[in-house]
Amino acid sequence: MKVLLELLLGYSVLILAHELPYLPSTRHPPKEELPYWCTYVKNCDFCWDCQNDICKNKITNESISINSIVNCRVTRDSPSQSCFYEISVKMPNHHSMECSHPRPYTGNEIFMEKWGGGGDYWPIIIRHCCFYLVFSIAFVGYIVFVYNKNLHLNTTMKLLALLSILIWLSQPALNRPLSIFYMKQNLPRTYTPPVRELEYWCTYAKHCDFCWTCKDGMCKNKVFRDHPIITQNDYIVNCTVSRWHDRCMYEAHFRIHYQHNMNCSQPKDLEWFIELKRHVINQDDL
């Protein structure tokens, strides 16, 4: 096993010994780079061949259950030599690293191995709720303690810093950042944006599937009630949306992959799709 790991590491170094070309966001990195990516995110779907609910590793021939496999995306930016991978389970996680100094993705490892890409994720939600409850009780208790003891500011700040460190150390157990801190600033890449944001996304990416409710081949817009009903194959595509502070992005996933970045405060319509469907797309292909 040790020899195998050394070979994988050596192969990874060889891959990174020359300037790597740009790798767009993709679920399937080049075959020659599989040892590199599969060393650091070994549960990603592109590392495995699955048959009859049993998956065999393409690199090590190791076998695991299909329930432990998750969908992943990998990206590499050549100028900055930064590598990025996203683990898309019930609650997506993102990880950036230097391509020449990669790090295994340990923060979500337990979650992947135990819950995989399917199954019931209520235990994770319950764990988060319990943590928030304990954190709230601890915070209130801390305020009461400081008030009763009449502590000086210096001591108060030390205790607050200690509490913050404890919260930070608890993150690996929660498998994701505290959503209460990131909810407004960062929207993970997801197929279904929050309901409160549907009007925003469906205004500029109106052909995305999350904007429509379809039944018996007919689709009704979720946001604009006066929008005419359309047929289910009338240019509705799977979409992914993301938001980082003031930068928003949506991707359309179908025969031709498209990614569009925009300023969140100055969004642009998905105009390319109108021309594309007019000249290229056949409804039977969607």
Swiss-Prot record:
Would you say which domain of life the source belongs to? Viruses
- Cystine links in this protein are none
Q: Where in the cell is it found?
A: Host membrane
InterPro entries cross-referenced by the UniProt entry: ASFV_fam_110
- Pfam families linked to this entry: v110
Question: Where is the major localization of this protein?
Answer: host cell
Q: What are its GO cellular component terms? A: host cell membrane; membrane
Tell me the keywords, alphabetical order.
Glycoprotein, Host membrane, Membrane, Transmembrane, Transmembrane helix
What does this chain do?
Plays a role in virus cell tropism, and may be required for efficient virus replication in macrophages.
Family (UniProt): Belongs to the asfivirus MGF 110 family.
In Swiss-Prot or TrEMBL terms, this protein is called Protein MGF 360-3L
Name the species this protein comes from.
African swine fever virus (isolate Tick/Malawi/Lil 20-1/1983) (ASFV)
